[in-house]
Amino acid sequence: MIENNKGLKFYDNLDLTHSHNDEDLQDVYKEWAAAYDHDNDNLLGTVSQPLSVQIFQEYIKDKSLRIIDVGCGTGLVGAELEKGGFSNFDGIDISQEMIDIAKQRGYSKLFIGSLNDSLPCENNEYDAAFCVGVFTHGHVGSERLDELVRIVKPGGIICFTINEGVYESYGFNSKIKKLESENVWK
């Protein structure tokens, strides 16, 4: 049986980490992987993954697009993409334990990598990218939006969430405005 408050302990550990240190994050997710989905559904509220895919589907009708889920974790976005009829999506995460769970969720390919580094992807390799739950406390800063732009084809879609607690302090507001003013995206 999973402790009712254990997920909050893991989440608090992430909030306190603030270091953008992948080794610290890997340690937390290694321990949390088995209970992650339960904790998101029952304690933290899984809303961003299904909502992100729902909004994506309102604009994208081509189910054959090549998609990458950056920071795929246990594959919550992948499960929603699969429900929506998409079948050509890959995932990348820093945690092998999370990827092991994601293997059951329709991904074409899963691999280890971190958005804090260059992703093992070609320039313009994907039609779309998801990055849900990654831009948050102690994970990844705003400068890494450039890496998502690099791997998505011109005219492609990048669907991401940002924790409101880091929107200003991690520089997302200014980075998004800069990318818009430079016509990198709209």
PLM segments and residue spans:
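N-terminal auxiliary segments of SAM/dcSAM-dependent transferases
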Residues: 1-22
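Conserved SAM-binding loop and adjacent beta-strand
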Residues: 38-53
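Class I SAM-dependent methyltransferase SAM/SAH-binding core
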Residues: 68-118
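A short acidic, Gly/Pro-enriched loop at the edge of an enzyme's catalytic core
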Residues: 119-129
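A short beta-strand submotif of the Rossmann-like class I SAM-dependent methyltransferase core
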Residues: 131-134
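A short glycine-rich, Lys/Arg-flanked "PGG" loop and its adjoining helix->strand segment in the class I
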Residues: 142-154
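Conserved beta-strand signature within the Rossmann-like core of class I S-adenosyl-L-methionine
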Residues: 155-164
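Conserved Class I S-adenosyl-L-methionine
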Residues: 170-186
